Each structure stands twice: as structure tokens, then as C-alpha cells.
Amino acid sequence: MEHSRGDSVEAGEEEEGRGGWDSRSAGTFSSSCTDCSSYCSSDLEPEWLDRVQKNGELFYLELSEGEEEILLPLSPLEPVGVNHVRFSDNEAEILPEDRKNVRKNSEPRFRKLAKMLKKKNNKKGSAELNRQACPTSILKQNSRQKPGIIVHYQYRDTCLYVNPDHLPEDEHKKTSNLLQALIGIVHQSSRNSKRSERQGRQESNQRLSNQEKLVVHGFIPGSPAIRCGQVLIGDTLVAVNDVEVHVENIERVLSCIPGPMQLKLTFETPVLYSGMGLKNQNNQAQTSINDLASLVWGDEHTNSQQDLQHMPHIVMYLTLRLDSETSKEEQEILYQYPVSDASHKLKSIRGLFLTLGDMLQNVTGAPIVSSSLILNGELVHVSYWKENDKLFLISVPAQRFPLLQLKNVTADLVRTLKFMYSTLDRAFCQAENISRLDHFFSLFFQRVLRVFLLSGITGYGPQFYDACSSLLVENLPGVRWLSLPEDIKIQIDTVLSDLEALDFAELSEDYYEMRRLYMIIGTCIFYKGYLLSNHLPKEDLVDVVLYCRQYCLLALASERIGQLIIWREVYPRYHLKHCGSPATEECSEPGGRYFLLIVGLKHFMLCTLLEAGGCTSKATGNPGPDYIYVDQVKATLLQLEMLDLNLEERLGSAPNPCLSCADWFLPSARDKLGNFTSSIVLNKLQTPKRTTSPVSKRRLFAEAASSLRTRRPSPTRSSGGSDSGTDGAGESVGVITHSSPDMARKFGRRESLGSGGSDGSGGSGTLLKINKKKYSLPNPFSSASLRKNLSERETDDIYNTIKLTSGPENTLFHYLYFETLQGVFISPTHKEVEQLGGSIHPQLIKNFHRCCLSIRSVFQQALNKKNSKHSDSKACVDVAGFDPIKEHGVLFECSPENWNDQKKSPPTMSYWVVGRLFMHPQPQELYVCFHDSVTEISVELAFKLSFGIPL
């Protein structure tokens, strides 16, 4: 399974299933030196080594020490993503018994292997142990009950996060204090506690009955037991991770904990009244499907699981070629998820789907894309993807998922499956992939339902913005780009280039005198889900982003993870498409195998695409991750940790370009600010001094921010662009020549030099400046404009603040720019949107993304017609200057929802959502949302200034 962090892989099976490397590619050297991980000279072994599956795949997740207690569910289920201990009746093991080459030297992350406890059971105890395949049940009733009294025992499971790495060195030597130092439970032993030790060898049951129980007598301040709040004085600790414990073996069991993990402690509480039955809860280990979802979404995951049970949804992979000789029932179904009552009715009408997928194409000549039907009074959308004689379809309720979004998501799912398994047939027709696909689609439907639930949340916050933006963002074949100052970007690119060069001692060919195992195709690095730098081809970047998006890795990186390591073989279509094409004169790529390595530390996540074969060693079998490459990627991330503060400062900085809140433009707000021109702040700003130092300017703006607590309203709609340059506006042109984002948000306006009219000089009138040089938004893909460090951001905002709209007011509410050539898009960050607040602005954000989804569907139809072979392109003369530019816009009118004044009608505000598609030199999409007062000339200017990229 893809996310099988909680699954244990036996060492014997692992060695049989894991592949190695072709020794012939290493020349005359010994085959024992072909796998670097097998002859490591170090005495340390990676903590993730036991998690590598038989097919070579690895998914290892370890949360940070502070976040693990919060994010992991407090349930008596087996923890995930951390090191495990394998327990038996009276023993605790770290590695399987057949594990070889045990390492002795260790560092804080690699705990010393504890000595295995010797079994001292007698013949009867050994026979019982052999008959039981699992640890003895701890849910036993006490046989020594007083006559006439019915005593039952309640067993309560509690999860505690423990980290033995934080214990002082002297605590490791004092093994008798582990119960207090590690868990925080104080137990006072009685005087006759060792009486059972003097009784010699007795029957196993008699021996266990004489052993002293671990009664909780107190707690250590600040310990995990105190923080948990579920452990009470008087409780009896009877088991640790389903292993029965007592005074004699508790310290030995705790000493074998290898690293940070969550322990399941089972406490016993006697109940003295009759009539209460003992409930034996059969708690099984939580699957990785729920683990990953609960880690990312927390309590929302539980709600979505319950709603999914009643939501009609299904994924099916059907075959159109049926065997008439065999009358096997449901033979046309190659794969189905889920198998539940909710999907039964959709499954029963699969014949309709097969008919539409096959016969409709024969009639119309075009494959079916989607259909809608009413099922039990509910509208359901169905999306199709046909390849050869196979039909892949997804069905979801229309209320939960728009049809336009379902079409795009279906194409993304197919692309991700091909990236993981090469073909759809290989993915759905191999039995070993069934559980992995169940995991894959379970996460998909949980994401769908979560977005729907969050979109109905009242209020405004990060979750609401996530739900609104995902409607459009998750349909874009790209990732959100975080624009950075040039010096920060150069540092990141330099570090990534050093990694890609593989010019390290253990990665060089001269170190082991052999060919390298892999060649790095490219890398891309993320911070909290934002793309910082990309060295991958665009197609590879999109494949990696879709994979990370499907498995919630971008959302997971927004949390502070301790360590994330993912390794699997992938099939990037860009490279496989260019392999072995001798017919073309272009240089074809060698036929090799490709592997994806993802390493995450804290908020950073680095994705690396590697190639085996060609100029590197040829991979055979199912090779697992090589620890040298993993360590070098970790070292790269540690090298970039110094930029953490700068990146946080960038995410928390003021919006650039500047944004306005829709609530500032309501007429009611304008009435309250009627005496704005007579304010003290404006009098201070109207001083004729222009040579004020930056320090005094910051002091002036600080005074303005503290004295002005309201927003500047928008002007009335003008008939033309030249109306913004009236005398009244001209008097204030020289007033705010240098403005900070904070000041502008308080005023709600952006003054500028120039009128922004239609005579062609409006370009300089839309940008704040102190020199005669024009400023434009930086091109994130060009190193033409150098900027200062992020530490000087507060000073630079005064001089380099940019607004896209012309006129005295900043009327830009939201924007999104999608660069198809690079596979990235730029939009305001979450913090930038949160800073605006407002009551009607959240509804504006929601309408913006919903409208952009519809506009983009029109753009996609235009692109498909252009790329279609059946389009009559020869009939039109292709002139670059006359090439059509697609533009669509929708006018909205909104008002406050909760309007209590019955005598007056609620104030209204109109705004536009406009999308434009540029065809040359490459397709580019730009979506903006602005106030209705903006003229057409101003809109044209805003498009021309789209991030400094020439049209």
C-alpha cells in the first residue's frame, strides 16, 4: 500500500522482495559492492529501513515532537509514522528475530538496541505461548473474588506520546526510574512485593497472580501522564501496547522503546455493582488511509467518514469486451470502490454507463465526457475516461462536486495513476494494487467531501479560503508559486544545483570506483505548500504536484512534520514519450527507470526525480531507497533551514500588489467617512516637505495608522478614465507620493502620480514611485530585477508598493495568474487574504473562484479547438498581432447578508470577475476581481501589467 507506515514488513520477506542492481554495470568489481546500502561502512542504519516494502516502496512519516501529541488521534489504536516495538507476552523486541547486522553505535535518533529478555516460562507456559499466535489477552477477570460479590473490571485505553531521546543520559542508566521519567507515573511498591520471587518455580498462572500490580499512586509534574488528563490515581496499569506488565517487567519493557512514539496504556478499574457486562473492544490497527487523513484534517476526518457512508459515490473500471462463453456475474467490473450500500445503486446501472461509453461514440464519433442523472431524487454527475476497450468512470453528487470540476479532476486522476503505474490496465488489473487503489480513492473522496463541508462554514479563516480556492486551484495543472527576493531565490537555486550535480564524496563515481546508482533529473522544493524553486521540466513538475496533491502532502507540509520520506518507482510520461524514437532526428532519451524521492523536514519538502539506467547503473528488481541519496537530500533541506524566518516574513508581509476589501466600498462606509478630509492625519500628510527621511516617514505612517481606524470609500463610477484626474484628485496627487501597505489599507486608497487617463500615459499613473523610473510587478521566472533582503521588507514597502488599477483608489479585490509554460500560478497568500477580513469579502472570494472555474472551461474549449486536428486552422491567416485574445467577465452585485434596518434597503456594491486568455507566446490565463468603478482602459492596463511579463 502506498501509505503503509503502520504496516510491519518482515525482514525475511523484505530481503527476498527487494531488488538490487545489475552487477554487470559495475564492470569487474564485486557484485557485493553494487548496492551502497548493503555495504555501508557506518554502524548506523536508517530508522526507516524496516518500513521498505517488498516492492521497494517506502512511505515513512514522523511528526515533530511538539505536533505529534496534537495531530495524532488520541485513540487506543496503533500509532503511525514513528518507530515501533514488537511485543510478545513478556518480551519486547525492536527488530525481528531474524534481523542481522544489528548496529551497536548510535546517535540520539538511533536508539541502542536493548537486550532481548530470556524466556523463563515452564513447559506449560511455553505450550500456551506456542498455541497463541498473538499476545495473551489482558482482558481477564480476577479469579479471587469474594463470594456473593460480582466484580467486573473495566479496561480503559489511553495513548501517551513519549520520547526517550529527551531523557538525560543518567536516566538511561537508572532503569528503575523509567516509569516515572518516561511516563510520569509514581508507583510505591509494598513491603511484600518480592514475596513471589522467593516461591521458586511455580505454575505460570500462579506466578502471575502473585506479581504486584502497578497501581498509580501519583504523578510527576509536567509529565505525559499529567498532560493527558485521562490517568487517575488509583488506576492499575495492566498493559503497554497490549503486553501485560507488572512491577517486575515494566522497566524492561519501557527500556526497549527505540524512539519517539505513542504508547497505548491499558488501565484496569474494578466495578463492584452487578449487571454490567464486560465489553471486549476489538480495536484493530488503523489503516494508513485514515491515518493520513486524520493527520491532515484532524476532527474533520471523523465527520467526513460518517457522511461518506450515506453519500452516493463510486469509482469503477469497466471492460467493454465481455466473454460470452462464461456467465460469470459482474465480469465487466475490473475494479470498484467503495463496496458499500451507498454505491450499490450506481453499480446496478453500470449497463447504462457501458452503453453510453460504447454506442454513443459510434453514433456521434466523439467519446463521452460526462453525464448527469437523478438517483433517488438527487442529481448525480458521472465523468468518463475511455481507453481502448476499457471505461473508467467516477460518480459524485452534484451538490458536493460541480461538473466542471469533476471533468478536470478525472483527467488529473488518470494522469496520476499513469504516473504511478504506467497504464490504467496495470493499475486496476493487478491484484496487489487493489488495496493501494482503495487508499488512493478514499483520500480523493474525503478531499471532495471536506471541501464541501468547509465551504458551508460561516465566518472567515484559513479553512474557508482553502475550500473556496480549491474549487479552482485543484483544477489547475500547476502549483502555487511564492515570489521571493532575488537573493533568496539565488541561494535556493544554488543549493539545489549543488545537489543535482551529485558532486559529493559518496555520490561521486570515484568514491566507490563504480558507476552511480542514479542520475538526478531535477528537483523542486516547497515550503508550506508553496513552490519556492523548480528545476524540473514542466510536465514532470505537474506529475509530481498532482501526486503530492492527491496524497495531501502539500497540506501536510503546512504542519510542522519531523521527517517524511517517500520512495517509489514512477513513470513520467514526458521522458517515456521521448524514449526510443529513432524515427526522429532529435536526441532520444535512454530507456531507463525513474524513481521519485520526497523528503520533508519541518515545513520544507524537496521532491527529487531520479533516473536509473543510461549513463548510470541499471536497476533490477525492486530497489529500495539508497540511504546516501536520502541523507544528501536531508542535508540540502538542513542547509535551507536558515531561510525559515525570511520565508515566514515573506508570507506575513503586506500584499503586493495591494488588495482592497469589498466592505470598504459599501455606501454606508462612505457616509461615515464624510469628514475624512478634515482629519489630522491628512493635515500631516499635506506638508510640502518631500525630502523626509525613511525613518521620519515610518514614524508618520505609524501615527497615521494609530489615529485612523476607518476605511476610505471608493469613488463613484466615472464615465471615463480621464475623470479620475479632476481637480480634486489633482490636489491630492502630491500628497501621498510614498505609501506603505499598512497605510493604504487604513485609508483604503492608493494615490498615484498621473491621472491614469486614456491618452497612453496611464501606465505611469498606476504605480507608486519616487523616481522617474517605472515599476512593474516582478517576473518570477526572470532574474532581471534584483531586490533587497526580506529583512528590509518593511522599508522597501514604502517605496516599491504596486497597485494594478488606475485612479486614486485601489479597486483590486483578488487575482490569479496562471503561467502554463512553467506550470505555476500566482495568487494572494492565505495571510494576505486574512488581513482584509470583512463581512461581504468572503462571499466575493467564493464567487471569484466559482466564476473563474466557469470562465476557464470556456478557455479550455478554445484551446482544444486550436489544438484539434479537425479545426480549420488553414482557413485563417495566423497573424501574431491579430490572434484572438479570449476574454470573459461577469458582473456581480452584493450586499450585507444580515441587514437589520427594515426602513432602509441594504447597501449594494458591484464588482467584476474578468478572465483573459493570452495565446502568444504561450497560453497564459489571468483572472482579476475589481470594483465596478474601474473603466475599460484601466482594466486593459491592469492586464498589460500582469507580473511584468510582456504580452
From Swiss-Prot:
The GO annotation for biological process reads:
ciliary basal body organization; cilium assembly; establishment of planar polarity; nervous system development; protein localization; regulation of smoothened signaling pathway; vesicle-mediated transport
**UniProt-listed SMART domains:** PDZ (SM00228)
- What is the role of the protein in this entry? Plays a role in the definition of cell polarity via the planar cell polarity (PCP) cascade. Required for ciliogenesis by controlling the organization of the apical actin cytoskeleton and the positioning of the basal bodies at the apical cell surface, which in turn is essential for the normal orientation of elongating ciliary microtubules. Proposed to function as core component of a functional module called CPLANE (ciliogenesis and planar polarity effectors) involved in recruitment of peripheral IFT-A proteins to basal bodies.
Q: Which family does it belong to?
A: Belongs to the inturned family.
- Domain (PDZ): give its ranges: 187-269
Per UniProt, the ranges with Gly residues bias are 754-765
The species this protein belongs to is: Xenopus laevis (African clawed frog)
Q: Which Pfam families match?
A: Intu_longin_1, Intu_longin_2, Intu_longin_3
- Coarse class of the primary localization is other
Regions of biased composition (Low complexity) lie at: 715-726
Its annotated compartments are: Cell surface; Cell membrane; Cytoplasm; Cytoplasm, Cytoskeleton, Cilium basal body
Q: Has UniProt tagged this entry with the keyword Cytoplasm?
A: yes
Under the heading InterPro entries, the entry gives: CCZ1/INTU/HSP4_longin_1 (IPR043987), CCZ1/INTU/HSP4_longin_3 (IPR043989), CCZ1/INTU_longin_2 (IPR043988), INTU (IPR039151), PDZ (IPR001478), PDZ_sf (IPR036034)
List where Basic and acidic residues composition bias occurs.
743-752
Cellular component, GO annotation: apical part of cell; cell surface; ciliary basal body; cilium; cytoplasm; plasma membrane
**Region described as Disordered:** 1-32, 189-208, 687-765
Provide the protein name. Answer: Protein inturned
Describe its assembly.
Interacts with fuz and wdpcp; fuz, intu and wdpcp probably form the core CPLANE (ciliogenesis and planar polarity effectors) complex.
